[in-house]
């Protein structure tokens, strides 16, 4: 109640003091203060974050596992681009205070009638050179938030952004792949592989879904797919029509090599995994088989809207996504933030969630 009165008083003064929690160097957070000016006439909403989720990209920054030139250019910076919150101000009075929303980290400054917003070089992305959601309040354009279903578990919804990445990749795959869907292979037994498997099993119910992974205890979580296979023991008879690579890192080279070897002619390979270093690809076999390689990165408004519609249409998808939730941390201090990030470094599977009380 006191917090709401404080917010209302600040809004009446048409200025807000916002505390932003930035990574200033590897493993070191500091709080800084910035003002939010409500005098200007630009349409905006202000969101109070409620739950956030740590992503692999956040960990790379936190641990300093990026090129030193990139770190010096982008830091200090607030981390995290996966978050849900509640509206505390809407300049157009379209959304009521307290409305629960998911926030879209991609911020386009221009539009294009062909190229998607997440591929425009003019777009900005939160927690990648621009402050992320580790703030007291987030100022956004009205089209950068999507209203959530009323009964949704906000802690599970916190990693909706990662779900939209998979939704976006599947849409691109649909638009470019030949219409042969007897079998689909997914490489990767981590968070993104799990989400992609959940979605493909729902969107292609009659297609055989096979997940290829390295670790048996992770693969055991994919009990809803048709078959799981360890990458060190792939049967010679296995063939797939199309593939989704969700491995990333050094392992993406082996994954792509295996895909090329067992995929049927004219199949499509959707690449979702991120590798910091260049990898080798057997282009001879890509040409010989007539394969299509589809790159996907991030997501935009349409992908968020489609994902929320999937939540409403298939509530069982949310139940499966809930199994991805790992440990939840209550964040009241910067020390709590450090504890959560340190935990996530050694977290082998699942999404670490932050309840944002700070």
Predicted ranges, named:
Residues 101, 184, 243:
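Receiver (REC) domain switch-region micro-motif
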Residues 176-180, 203-204, 219-291:
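Glycine-rich cofactor phosphate-binding loops and adjacent beta1-alpha1 units
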Residues 15-18, 301-358:
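C-terminal hydrophobic helical "lid"/dimerization subdomain
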Residues 1-15:
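N-terminal amphipathic/basic-hydrophobic helices that include classical n-h-c signal peptides
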Residues 82-84, 99-100, 137, 189, ...:
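Residue-level marker of beta-strand positions
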Residues 5, 152-232:
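Mid-domain Rossmann-like dinucleotide-binding core that forms the NAD(H)/NADP(H) cofactor-binding site
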Residues 37-52, 67-110, 149-151:
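Glycine-rich beta-strand-centered segment in the early N-terminal region that forms part
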């Amino acid at each position: 109640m006191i917090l709401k009165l404080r917010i209302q008083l600040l809004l009446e003064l048409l200025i807000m003091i916002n505390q932003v929690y930035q990574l200033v160097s590897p493993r070191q957070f500091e709080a800084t203060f910035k003002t939010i000016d409500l005098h200007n006439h630009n349409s905006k909403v202000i969101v109070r974050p409620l739950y956030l989720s740590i992503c692999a990209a956040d960990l790379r920054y936190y641990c300093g596992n990026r090129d030193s030139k990139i770190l010096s250019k982008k830091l200090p910076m607030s981390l995290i681009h996966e978050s849900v919150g509640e509206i505390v101000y809407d300049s157009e009075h379209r959304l009521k205070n307290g409305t629960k929303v998911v926030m879209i980290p991609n911020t386009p400054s221009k539009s294009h009638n062909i190229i998607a917003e997440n591929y425009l070089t003019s777009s900005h992305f939160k927690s990648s050179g621009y402050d992320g959601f580790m703030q007291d309040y987030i100022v956004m354009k009205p089209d950068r938030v999507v209203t959530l279903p009323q009964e949704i578990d906000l802690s599970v919804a916190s990693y909706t952004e990662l779900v939209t990445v998979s939704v976006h990749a599947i849409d691109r795959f649909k638009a470019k792949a030949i219409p042969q869907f007897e079998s689909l292979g997914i490489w990767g037994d981590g968070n993104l592989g799990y989400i992609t498997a959940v979605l493909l099993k729902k969107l292609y119910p009659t297609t055989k879904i096979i997940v290829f992974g390295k670790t048996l205890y992770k693969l055991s979580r994919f009990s809803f797919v048709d078959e799981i296979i360890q990458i060190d023991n792939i049967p010679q008879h296995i063939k797939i029509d199309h593939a989704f690579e969700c491995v990333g890192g050094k392992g993406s080279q082996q994954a792509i090599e295996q895909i090329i070897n067992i995929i049927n002619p004219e199949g499509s390979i959707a690449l979702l995994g991120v590798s910091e270093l260049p990898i080798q690809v057997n282009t001879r076999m890509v040409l010989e088989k007539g394969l299509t390689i589809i790159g996907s990165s991030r997501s935009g408004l349409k992908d968020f809207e489609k994902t929320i519609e999937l939540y409403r249409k298939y509530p069982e998808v949310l139940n499966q996504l809930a199994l991805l939730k790992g440990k939840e941390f209550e964040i009241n201090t910067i020390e709590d933030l450090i504890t959560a990030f340190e935990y996530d470094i050694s977290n082998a599977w699942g999404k670490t969630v932050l309840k944002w009380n700070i």
